[in-house]
Amino acid sequence: GVGWVVFWAIKHAQKNNMTYKNFASEHGYEFDQAQGNDNYRDYSTNVTRNEKTVTLSQSPFVEKYANFTQYPFGHGTERKVAYVISGDYKNTPFQAFTYHFVGQDSDKSKPGGVFSIVLIQCPDTPRRQLTDQMFYENGFLCEYQQGNLNVETIHERIDHLRKLV
């Protein structure tokens, strides 16, 4: 029944939380659950709603961690930031987190969903060509993928970004 589903969702969120928390403490990184237990769901398909006009009150976590204009940021509604891991890896300040938003039918080119975000501080514009799922904004080089953040790939994704700087 519904009770079991809710119980499972809570257990699942707690398990995710522990995975991220353990990874952060193992490597001496900061961890912020942010909106990590906001009834968080794993969307494998695109999520859209038919909403033409939306007034957004930004979550403080979105303001703090996801204050960018380029896709997947700055679009849609119900923007959420969850499970933020931040620190220095090989002397490179970084942040990694799961980002979610609900897309709008009026803008099919920017589908909503769940994104795994890794970004590094990068004071100068990157010298190399960025691939599709990357952008440079506000002194950060950012790369995003579909799905929840996976701790197993954070370091390799940072290494990949470092090569572009």
Language-model-detected regions and their locations in the chain:
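Generic hydrophobic/packing signal
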Residues: Y20, R49-K52, I154-R157
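Hydrophobic, Leu/Ile/Phe/Ala-enriched alpha-helical segments that form helix-helix packing faces
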Residues: Y20-G28, I158-V165
